[in-house]
C-alpha cells in the first residue's frame, strides 16, 4: 500500500547567547570592589512540536526560515542577562526530520504534543565576575555569547489524502484536481486515464489546507476486482471526506443519477464503513448543454429517496474547466473536514518499525590549510566557536585564547607544517603573527 510523500526544506537558526560583561564594583565605603560583570542570557532554541490539527507541510512552502532570538547581554552588579524565549514551530503528526546535507534522520515526530529541539541556542558568555582568581582578583576579561546552532532541514510527511475524488471514469476528476491544486495529473478523454492516485494540496482563500486525491476511475464490479478494483477502493478507504464527482452533461450517454447510485453501491459492497464518510456531490461540467436540466432532474430523484428529516448530501454545481463554483466547494469541504473525525489511517501492513544506527567519527578540533597568499588558515567547529566567543577588544581575552590554542595543540601542529616566526595565521577575517 503506497502512501503519498509531502516534502519541504527549511532553515533553522537558534539564538545566539548574550555577551558577558566587564564591570567593576565602585561604591562608596567599598574598598577594592572587584569584578561585577554578569553573564549573558542563553539564546532561544528552535523546537518542533507536533500539532495533530495540521495535515500537510504546505505552510513551510511560504515560510522556510525560522530564527530564534538572542539572549540579552550580561549586566552590572553581577546580574545575568535574560534568556531568550524558545521558538516553537508546529509540524504535522508523522513528520520525519532529516539533515538536508547528510540525509540523516534527526527525529520522527509521531505523537501529538511531542517536542524536539532541532537547533540549540548558544549559551551566554561569562562576565568578568566569573574569571576572578586569587592571582587575578580584577580580571578585564569576558566572553562573547556562543552562536546558536544553524542547519538546513528536510521535512517529510507520509500522508494519506483527507479528501478523495470518486466517480466514473472521465467525469472530470483530474481536471478538477489540476485547477484546485498545483498537481499535474495526466488528463485525457478516455477511461482510466488515472491509473494511480494523484495527490494535490489545496489552500482555500480563508487559509485552510488539506490533501486531495484524484483516485482511479471506478466502474461497476470494482468491489469484485473489475477494472482497477480493490486497489482503488483501498485508497478511498482511508479518506475522511468524499467528493462524488458527477458528469451533469451526461456526455457519455449515462444518467447522472444512475452513476451516483452505481458508485455508492460499489463503496457499500466493498466496505460498509465507506458510506460513513460524509459526501459532497460535485455536479461537474455545468457549462455544457443540458447540464442545468439534468441537475434539476438529479435533485428531484435525490429528494425522492430521502426523508424530510434525513441529512441529504450537499450539491455544488461547478465547471472544473471553466473554474466556476470552486471557492464555495472548497470552503464547504474544509468545514466538513473540521467536523469529521479520523477514520482508519494505517493497517498492520503499513506499520514499519525503523531503527537508525550510525557511527560518527569524532570531529577534528581544528584543520590547517595554506591560503594563496601563504597565510596559514585555521578552521574547525570547535576552534571557530572558541574564537567567536573571545572578546578580541580585551588583551586578557586574547591572551586566554592564545593559551587555549596552545592547549589544543595548534602551535605544535603549525610548527610541524613548517610555520616560521612571523608567518601570518588567519581565523576567519582575524589575522595574527605566529610566534615561535
From Swiss-Prot:
<feature type="binding site">
    <location>
        <begin position="214"/>
        <end position="217"/>
    </location>
    <ligand>
        <name>GTP</name>
    </ligand>
</feature>
<dbReference type="InterPro" id="IPR015349">
    <property type="entry name" value="OCT_dom"/>
</dbReference>
<keyword id="KW-0479">Metal-binding</keyword>
<feature type="binding site">
    <location>
        <begin position="167"/>
        <end position="174"/>
    </location>
    <ligand>
        <name>GTP</name>
    </ligand>
</feature>
<dbReference type="InterPro" id="IPR036726">
    <property type="entry name" value="GTP1_OBG_dom_sf"/>
</dbReference>
<dbReference type="InterPro" id="IPR031167">
    <property type="entry name" value="G_OBG"/>
</dbReference>
<feature type="binding site">
    <location>
        <position position="174"/>
    </location>
    <ligand>
        <name>Mg(2+)</name>
    </ligand>
</feature>
<keyword id="KW-0460">Magnesium</keyword>
<dbReference type="GO" id="GO:0000287">
    <property type="term" value="F:magnesium ion binding"/>
</dbReference>
<keyword id="KW-0378">Hydrolase</keyword>
<keyword id="KW-0342">GTP-binding</keyword>
<dbReference type="InterPro" id="IPR006073">
    <property type="entry name" value="GTP-bd"/>
</dbReference>
<comment type="subunit">
    <text>Monomer.</text>
</comment>
<dbReference type="GO" id="GO:0003924">
    <property type="term" value="F:GTPase activity"/>
</dbReference>
<comment type="similarity">
    <text>Belongs to the TRAFAC class OBG-HflX-like GTPase superfamily. OBG GTPase family.</text>
</comment>
<feature type="domain" description="OCT">
    <location>
        <begin position="358"/>
        <end position="436"/>
    </location>
</feature>
<dbReference type="Pfam" id="PF01018">
    <property type="entry name" value="GTP1_OBG"/>
</dbReference>
<dbReference type="InterPro" id="IPR005225">
    <property type="entry name" value="Small_GTP-bd"/>
</dbReference>
<dbReference type="InterPro" id="IPR006074">
    <property type="entry name" value="GTP1-OBG_CS"/>
</dbReference>
<dbReference type="Pfam" id="PF01926">
    <property type="entry name" value="MMR_HSR1"/>
</dbReference>
<feature type="domain" description="Obg">
    <location>
        <begin position="2"/>
        <end position="160"/>
    </location>
</feature>
<dbReference type="InterPro" id="IPR036346">
    <property type="entry name" value="GTP-bd_prot_GTP1/OBG_C_sf"/>
</dbReference>
<keyword id="KW-0963">Cytoplasm</keyword>
<comment type="function">
    <text>An essential GTPase which binds GTP, GDP and possibly (p)ppGpp with moderate affinity, with high nucleotide exchange rates and a fairly low GTP hydrolysis rate. Plays a role in control of the cell cycle, stress response, ribosome biogenesis and in those bacteria that undergo differentiation, in morphogenesis control.</text>
</comment>
<dbReference type="GO" id="GO:0005737">
    <property type="term" value="C:cytoplasm"/>
</dbReference>
<dbReference type="InterPro" id="IPR014100">
    <property type="entry name" value="GTP-bd_Obg/CgtA"/>
</dbReference>
<feature type="binding site">
    <location>
        <begin position="192"/>
        <end position="196"/>
    </location>
    <ligand>
        <name>GTP</name>
    </ligand>
</feature>
<protein>
    <recommendedName>
        <fullName>GTPase Obg</fullName>
        <ecNumber>3.6.5.-</ecNumber>
    </recommendedName>
</protein>
<feature type="binding site">
    <location>
        <begin position="319"/>
        <end position="321"/>
    </location>
    <ligand>
        <name>GTP</name>
    </ligand>
</feature>
<feature type="binding site">
    <location>
        <begin position="284"/>
        <end position="287"/>
    </location>
    <ligand>
        <name>GTP</name>
    </ligand>
</feature>
<dbReference type="InterPro" id="IPR045086">
    <property type="entry name" value="OBG_GTPase"/>
</dbReference>
<dbReference type="GO" id="GO:0005525">
    <property type="term" value="F:GTP binding"/>
</dbReference>
<dbReference type="Pfam" id="PF09269">
    <property type="entry name" value="DUF1967"/>
</dbReference>
<dbReference type="InterPro" id="IPR027417">
    <property type="entry name" value="P-loop_NTPase"/>
</dbReference>
<feature type="domain" description="OBG-type G">
    <location>
        <begin position="161"/>
        <end position="338"/>
    </location>
</feature>
<keyword id="KW-0547">Nucleotide-binding</keyword>
<dbReference type="GO" id="GO:0042254">
    <property type="term" value="P:ribosome biogenesis"/>
</dbReference>
<dbReference type="InterPro" id="IPR006169">
    <property type="entry name" value="GTP1_OBG_dom"/>
</dbReference>
<feature type="binding site">
    <location>
        <position position="194"/>
    </location>
    <ligand>
        <name>Mg(2+)</name>
    </ligand>
</feature>
